Amino acid sequence: MDAIQIVMFVMAILCLIIGLLLSNHGSTGGLASLSGQDLEIFRKTKDRGIVKILQITMFILVVLFLILGLVFHFAL
């Protein structure tokens, strides 16, 4: 295994853990799309505190995960 693969596995596990932590918070957070809940994506929500931090962290991790995936795909 290359170092980039290990980093991607760790990031994927972190994203899953954060998604599971956010899944009990409303219908817009976490893994709501997988559980069949109604998604209210364009509704304004006032998330504060740890929920907001987890949402931003998950967004950043997913973007980095996609970038690393593209780099890994085109590098080999």
Swiss-Prot record:
Molecular function GO labels? protein-transporting ATPase activity
Chief subcellular location equals: membrane
The record, for InterPro entries, names: SecG (IPR004692)
The topology of this chain with respect to the membrane is: Multi-pass membrane protein
Establish whether keyword Membrane is in the entry.
yes
Give the subcellular location: Cell membrane
Q: Which residues cross the membrane?
A: 3-23, 56-76
Q: Which UniProt keywords apply?
A: Cell membrane, Membrane, Protein transport, Translocation, Transmembrane, Transmembrane helix, Transport
Which GO terms fall under biological process for this protein?
protein secretion
GO terms under cellular component: plasma membrane
Q: What does this protein do?
A: Involved in protein export. Participates in an early event of protein translocation.
| Entry-linked NCBIfam families | secG
Regarding protein family, the annotation reads: Belongs to the SecG family.
Q: What is this protein called?
A: Probable protein-export membrane protein SecG
Q: What is the lineage of its organism?
A: Bacteria, Bacillati, Mycoplasmatota, Mycoplasmoidales, Mycoplasmoidaceae
